């Protein structure tokens, strides 16, 4: 079955796709409960295994995802949507750092670099200035979010780039992936 949707024949992949399509209560970022009607009740019920399926049905209706399924994961970009929320957040930040690595390499030591290191961490800065250039040709990507926080800036740049790449796979995939991230 998983070969038909472009994934290795492995039980774990089947489970990920099933959860992604039918059980948003499993992966929904907690902040979304604050924006849906009856969110406090849904939040409490989602922790009860007997009620989780009903909460998932409610969430699918609320987010207009009922009877829409993502079944084509042949493209590696589409598979990104199967990552959990924290992994997506790290991916977006690293992708943003990659897309701006030329700019970061030109920075001289100083206050801006220190604040950047504090925001994205020493590992993130090392990744952007030392490892990202080894990835080869980095696409020119024009998007600049309106934020002063470096971590948020790079995360938004990476998220925007991924969203553009994933747009071809349809709104149901993008919506479900978005539910894994903060509202």
Model-derived features with residue positions:
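General marker for long, soluble alpha-helical cores
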Residues: 1-183
């Amino acid at each position: 079955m998983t070969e038909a949707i472009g994934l290795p024949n492995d039980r774990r992949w089947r489970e990920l796709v099933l959860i992604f399509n039918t059980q948003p209560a499993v992966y929904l970022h907690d902040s979304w409960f604050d924006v849906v009607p009856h969110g406090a009740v849904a939040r409490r019920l989602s922790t009860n295994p007997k009620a989780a399926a009903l909460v998932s049905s409610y969430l699918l209706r609320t987010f207009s995802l009922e009877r829409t399924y993502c079944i084509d994961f042949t493209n590696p970009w589409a598979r990104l949507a199967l990552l959990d929320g924290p992994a997506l957040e790290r991916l977006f930040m690293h992708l943003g750092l990659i897309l701006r690595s030329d700019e970061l390499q030109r920075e001289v030591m100083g206050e801006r670099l220190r604040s950047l290191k504090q925001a994205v961490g020493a590992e993130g800065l090392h990744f952007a200035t030392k490892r990202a250039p080894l990835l080869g040709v980095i696409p020119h990507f024009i998007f600049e979010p309106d934020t002063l926080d470096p971590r948020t800036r790079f995360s938004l740049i990476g998220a925007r780039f991924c969203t553009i790449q994933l747009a071809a796979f349809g709104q149901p995939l993008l919506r479900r992936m978005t539910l894994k991230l903060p509202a």
